[in-house]
Amino acid sequence: MARPLLPLNALRAFEAAARHLNFSRAADELSVTPGAVSQQIRLLEDIVGGPLFVREARGLQLTDLGRSSVPLLREGFERLMDASALLREPPRRKQVSISVAPGFASKWLMPR
């Protein structure tokens, strides 16, 4: 049985917050409010059953769970960006050039 995916927005918020160790900077990067980032992190923490950050007066620190998952998330997002770039590329047309005598081209090749 397939395991359900975690919410992508929550994972994006977590990865950005982990990189910046700051909800406000993560929010700026994602063009959302710091409250929205905090809400997504709380949702993710509820789903995984434990804290991803230790919230301190001087900032955020990753828990062991948070620290161990960040490299995998970064790799996953890099792969998604690569796949997105590949899908956005216009398809390359394969072009074949042939050279034939003009009489052969007009009487035999072009009618086909």
Each language-model region and where it sits:
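Short helix-boundary/capping micro-motifs
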Residues: 16-31
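A short LG(V/I)-centered, amphipathic sequence patch enriched
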Residues: 45-62
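Short alpha-helical "packing" element that flanks the helix-turn-helix/winged-helix DNA-binding module
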Residues: 10-17, 69
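Short helix/strand-capping hinge loops at secondary-structure junctions
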Residues: 20-22, 48, 56, 111
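Core residues of bacterial helix-turn-helix
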Residues: 29-30, 41, 48, 69
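Interdomain hinge and pocket-entrance segments immediately C-terminal to HTH DNA-binding domains
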Residues: 87-106
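Alpha-helical linker/hinge and terminal dimerization helices associated
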Residues: 47-48, 69-90
